[in-house]
Amino acid sequence: MEWLNETFAGFDGGVFRAMHSLAEAAGGFLTPLTKLVTFIGEKGIVYFLAAIVLMLFPKTRRAGVCVFGAVGLGAILTSLTLKGIVGRERPFLANETFRAFWEFVGSPHEDGFCFPSGHVTSVTAAATALFVFFNKKWSGAGFFAVLLMAFSRVYLIAHYATDTLAGMLVGALSCAVAWGITKGIFCLLEKYPENKFCTFCLTFDVRALFRRAPKPPENGENE
C-alpha cells in the first residue's frame, strides 16, 4: 500500500541503509545466523510445540494454553487478515535500492505480503504469554528473542522495520486476548470439579504415565 510506504519512507529507508552498512562490514557473516533465526520461527511451529509441552503439566497448563492461543490468534490476525487487507509488497519487490540490498545480503525469496511480520507477531505473542505466567527475571529474556527476530527479518530485507513494529503490537494484543480466554476457560473448569472431564483437564500430569506401578508384595513378605 503506497500510503504506508510513503508515510514511513524516511524511517524504513534509514533502517535498511543501516542494515546494508552492517552487512557490508560483516562480510556475509550475519546472513546464515539471521536465516537460522528466521527458520526457527517459521510458521510458529516451535512456539506451538512449546505450548503443547507446557500443557502436559498441571503447574504450567495455563501458560501453555495461553501461548497456544496467543500464537494461533496472532497467525489469524496477520497471515489470514491484516496482510491481505493492507497488501504491502515485500521491500525487495517495491524498491530497486532495497532489491539491491536484498541481493547483496543473499536473502531467499519470500512470497506474500509483509505487513505485519508474522514471525515477529508469533514470537512476541509467545514471549508475552511466558512473561505473564513465569518468573519475570527469566521469562523477560524472551523479549530478547523478539528483538533478534525483528533484526533478522529486517536484515534479510524480508520486512520493513515498521512491519516488525506492527508485529510486536499484534503479538501483544493477541496475548492479551488469549490471556482473557485462558482465564475464562480455567474459571469454568474449576467451577465444576465434580465433572470428570473438568478434573482431567485440571489435574492430568504426563509424568503419571511413566511412573512405575508399585510391585505387589511377594508371598510371605508381610508375614
Where are these regions (language model features)?
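Loop-to-helix transition at the N-terminal end of transmembrane alpha-helices
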Residues: 36, 67-73, 165-168
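Membrane-embedded catalytic cores of phosphoryl/pyrophosphoryl-handling enzymes
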Residues: 102-223
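Membrane-helix interface segments
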Residues: 27-30, 59-64, 92, 134-141
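N-terminal transmembrane-helix/juxtamembrane module of multi-pass inner/ER membrane proteins
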Residues: 1-48, 80-109, 198, 214-215, ...
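Interfacial segments of alpha-helical transmembrane regions
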Residues: 50-78
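Membrane-water interface at transmembrane helix exits
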Residues: 54, 78, 82-87, 131, ...
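Hydrophobic alpha-helical transmembrane segments
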Residues: 38-57, 119-122
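Alpha-helical transmembrane segments of multi-pass membrane proteins
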Residues: 71-83, 149, 153, 175
